[in-house]
Amino acid sequence: MKNLEIYIHIPFCVRKCEYCDFLSFPADDDAKLRYVKGLMAEMIFYGPLMKNYQVFSVYIGGGTPSSIDEQWIAALMEGVFDCFNVLPDAEISIECNPGTLSREKLLAYRDAGINRLSIGLQSANNDELKLLGRIHTFEQFVTNYEVARNVGFKNINVDLMYGLPGQSASQYMATVNKIIRLHPDHISAYSLIVEKGTPFYEKYKFDMVRQEAGMRTEFLPNEDELYDMEKAGQKAFMDAGYRQYETSNYAKRGMECRHNIGYWTRADYLGLGIGAASLISNVRYTNTSDMDEYLSRCRHIHDVGDDIFRANLHVAADVIDKKGQMEEFMFLGLRMNEGVTREAFERAFGISIDAIYKDTIDSLKKQELLVVKAGHIYLSERGKDVANYVMAQFLRD
């Protein structure tokens, strides 16, 4: 059987954060219940189409999945187990906001088969949390983290963010050190990206121009400060026994996120819910992002028969040609510290990697941006600092 991972999008949140540009919004319980029913209809439709797949990862993301009733999460998990071939040791994750967690929810998640939590802390500084528009305090996070451990969760990720307005390296490291002392199994550390259409963009757009131009900034950390934060955090994580296995992700040995690795290695994945994307047999599908349209399409989803290519939830279906597949293989694979292997490339495409990328690899190796060793090709320490440049070299005209 082929491998598959499933992503379930829960778009709801209590309040949208100042920096957030994800597909998320507040809603009442009636709207949430209608949406859950839509997700169930989608699962029932796809189940028979995915009968030749075995599910190794399920990821419930958002939005804030922990903002909806825990019994609805349990119902969704029951639907997943009923409709798909879920492996006994599958990684099953849910994203949580510390401000919407409780012992009751954590027990319900555990009993529903969820075995991994991804808790969005972002900062251990309450002033920074308030600036970000987060609805929780650091103290709430610690309380719920300890409850999660007490009820039996043995795989917990904590999300952190650096490069916040007015943040110094010492402030970021204070957060890093507090989290390390809690010994989570996995840590994700992302630099703040100020996106258009967010409240942060309106506040800091002129600072962004200065930042991109290498000029002195008023609120946002400059490039050198961001670099110092990243490297200081990286050293602290690694000194504490975490292994950096991807650009922004650190894990204790054996606790790497399988869902992330599946994405970076181009495993097939099925996205359920509004705005969700899927990749099945090198065709990328995208669901509608309009809630009313999504619910209407879910009501008539079976009208198209059993052909995934004609499922009326999709507003786009793009076939990825061989060139695009190779490019994705390289720039997604190079995000991981172990990089890509010659063997995996040849197995995927029936041709040696040197036949396609020899000149590019040799050039980047000469610039000391790539390391080629024992069949592996991966970013050097210098290459990691200019990763976007390196990955762009594998985009063929």
Residue ranges and their predicted role:
Residues 376-380:
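Minor-groove-contacting beta-hairpin "wing" of winged helix-turn-helix DNA-binding domains
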Residues 351-363:
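Short amphipathic alpha-helical interaction segments
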Residues 345, 361-367:
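Basic amphipathic alpha-helical segments that dock to polyanions
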Residues 382-397:
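Short, amphipathic alpha-helical interaction segments positioned at domain boundaries
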Residues 2-3, 24-48, 53-351:
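C-terminal scaffold of the Radical SAM
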Residues 366-375:
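A short, conserved structural fragment
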Residues 2-10:
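Immediate flanking context of iron-sulfur cluster ligation sites
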Residues 11-24:
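Local cysteine-cluster metal-coordination motifs and their immediate loop/turn environment
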